[in-house]
Amino acid sequence: MALDENKRKAIDLAIKQIDKAFGKGALVRLGEKPVEKIDSISTGSLGLDIALGIGGIPQGRIIEIYGPESSGKTTLALQVIAECQKKGGICAFIDAEHALDVSYAKRLGVDAENLLVSQPDYGEQALEILETLTRSGAVDLIVVDSVAALTPKSEIDGDMGDQHVGLQARLMSQALRKVTGVLHKMNTTVIFINQIRMKIGMMGYGSPETTTGGNALKFYASVRIDVRRIASLKQGEQHIGNRVKAKVVKNKVAPPFREAEFDIMFGEGISQEGELIDYGVKLDIVDKSGSWLSYGDKKLGQGKENAKAFLKENKEIANEIQAKIIGAIGSSDEITTFGDDEDESENLES
């Protein structure tokens, strides 16, 4: 639609004034700025990467991972750190809970020697560290574990029984307002791990669950992932891991409400080989005959655990299966934007 000449001149003048005040590019016409592919960081789970729609979590955005205790939230965040480090990224872990298990992180593939770690004394300190790291432009990924542990200093200094209504929510709201724009400019991703609480006096319809820290994080997060443990995995009588469901309840860069299920093995993290078998069977890439699993003319093993062990030792076959799975589901790297189930048995026989 052609603009009136006077309006066009007025708009051009306004753009020049804005560029002079705030820097070139502060206001542009949509047609003048190229459409860019969203960069992503893999979660370490093939299924969750596919569910997220762009091959992982988006860079330069705020991500929230929440769920009940022992559901795999921190494990998932550590897997993202490991994947980011593999690409040469610099990562930081703000351990507000003072509970980071370094030996476990190493087993998940985290380069602990080069991981920046802070154990802040109170919430304001944690969020100031977050802001400083973000503004440096040198850090690719920051994990905050957890929102519930970001206790305001006034609450720590106060007496037991003192009322501090809404302090944490205001703290989070202020911090998110300050860092959101900087994150995008610096292409820094922040993952907030959060816990679930029950709503007090909840009656009638709606979920009785809510996350801590107020509503600000819900609004500022580009992606929110709900992580739940749905089954305990056994080998004979021994518990060897958990079956986890991750639901993308909010997604600003791809369609939301997609789900993924994967195994988290004790001491190992997300079982990537297990996902290859699960998706391979569903897509008829891996054949299942009784308890035997095979790929083409190659026997993978009897039972899922033996097949997983085979794929661990034969990376070429695992990569081939993964490529076929991605090809069958469709490329997850095609989302662009403007701007810089089957139930599984709880008992796994080997």
UniProtKB/Swiss-Prot annotation:
UniProt subcellular location: Cytoplasm
This protein's UniProt keywords: ATP-binding, Cytoplasm, DNA damage, DNA recombination, DNA repair, DNA-binding, Nucleotide-binding, SOS response
GO molecular function: ATP binding; ATP hydrolysis activity; ATP-dependent DNA damage sensor activity; damaged DNA binding; single-stranded DNA binding
Any one annotated GO CC term: cytosol
GO terms (BP aspect): DNA recombination; DNA repair; SOS response
Domain of life of the native organism: Bacteria
Record has DNA repair as a keyword: yes
InterPro entries recorded: AAA+_ATPase, DNA_recomb/repair_RecA, DNA_recomb/repair_RecA_CS, P-loop_NTPase, RecA-like_C, RecA-like_N, RecA_ATP-bd, RecA_C_sf
Binding site for ATP: G67, P68, E69, S70, S71, G72, K73, T74
Family stated for the protein in its record: Belongs to the RecA family.
PANTHER family per UniProt: MITOCHONDRIAL DNA REPAIR PROTEIN RECA HOMOLOG-RELATED, RECA
Described purpose of this protein according to its UniProt entry: Can catalyze the hydrolysis of ATP in the presence of single-stranded DNA, the ATP-dependent uptake of single-stranded DNA by duplex DNA, and the ATP-dependent hybridization of homologous single-stranded DNAs. It interacts with LexA causing its activation and leading to its autocatalytic cleavage.
Protein name in the entry: Protein RecA
Species this chain originates from: Wolinella succinogenes (strain ATCC 29543 / DSM 1740 / CCUG 13145 / JCM 31913 / LMG 7466 / NCTC 11488 / FDC 602W)
